[in-house]
């Protein structure tokens, strides 16, 4: 006590093999307007400096969520520890709009979803490429909720990613506002209802910008999601699929906005792992 030393007091699962974890470090970079952005960079297990590896960009929910330094081996929709053990690097940025960086930063995405936040994120991707870690020809993007929104938005704005995983995403800001259990959420962010500024709502909706998307896309959505109704997932899935772009939709029976059944969470984790291995590591 008082020395900040770590002391092992028990080891309940000593008989189980210990899975290796990738090194995680805090990364900082400048966005296009000079704003400093912070995030977490996870290296593949056994990473050799100077080697370029597949990069996965994970975008958090919220938008007021935040990535924190914490144990990487917990279960979640995206199996980050497994990704690292399979040779992927992982970037988890905290773009403008994230919590924990002050009020001005928290509200810097007002009326600007898909604007400054997108540029913050892409500047982080460029930084990892500049570091000689990410292979620019083998990059994937993924996220749940607002992270799913940003994932679907990202692939309407750039063709740099070879695969995307869109989870429980808001993809049509107009129809979302009329069907979600939080009808006032987007009006608070956009300064009015869709009928007050239909042009802005449409301009920032991935569905309205989906023409020309070529990124293979996995859409995942809970059938019982009332926060972001499953129709949002179907809208984007159909927009991508009808253009001839590879697309799959995983419907999760009984699941709300955040999946709660262990077997469903396991299904999501395995599906995401398989999806990115298929598209970023062909032949593996």
Language model features with spans:
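Serine-hydrolase catalytic core recognition
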Residues: 1-284
């Amino acid at each position: 006590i008082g020395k900040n030393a770590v002391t092992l007091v028990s080891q309940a699962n000593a008989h189980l093999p210990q899975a290796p974890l990738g090194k995680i470090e805090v990364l900082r970079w400048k966005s296009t307007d000079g704003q400093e952005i912070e995030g977490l960079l996870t290296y593949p297990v056994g990473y050799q400096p100077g080697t370029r590896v597949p990069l996965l960009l994970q975008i958090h929910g919220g938008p007021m969520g935040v990535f924190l330094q914490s144990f990487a081996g917990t279960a979640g929709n995206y199996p980050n520890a497994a990704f690292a053990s399979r040779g992927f690097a992982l970037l988890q940025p905290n773009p403008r709009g994230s919590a924990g960086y002050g009020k001005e930063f928290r509200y810097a995405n007002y009326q600007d979803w898909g604007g400054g936040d997108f540029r913050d994120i892409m500047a982080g991707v460029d930084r990892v490429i500049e570091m000689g870690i990410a292979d620019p020809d083998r990059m994937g993007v993924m996220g749940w909720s607002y992270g799913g929104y940003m994932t679907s938005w990202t692939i309407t704005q750039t063709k740099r990613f070879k695969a995307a995983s869109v989870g429980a995403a808001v993809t049509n800001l107009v129809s979302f506002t009329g069907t979600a259990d939080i009808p006032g959420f987007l009006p608070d962010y956009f300064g009015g209802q869709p009928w007050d500024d239909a042009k802005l709502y449409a301009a920032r909706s991935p569905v309205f910008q989906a023409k020309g998307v070529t990124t293979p896309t996995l859409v995942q959505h809970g059938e019982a999601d009332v926060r972001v109704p499953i129709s949002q997932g179907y809208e984007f899935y159909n927009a991508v699929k009808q253009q001839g772009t590879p697309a799959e939709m995983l419907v999760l029976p009984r699941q709300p906005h955040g999946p709660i059944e262990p077997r469903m969470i396991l299904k999501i984790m395995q599906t995401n792992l398989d999806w990115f291995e298929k598209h970023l590591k062909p032949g593996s």
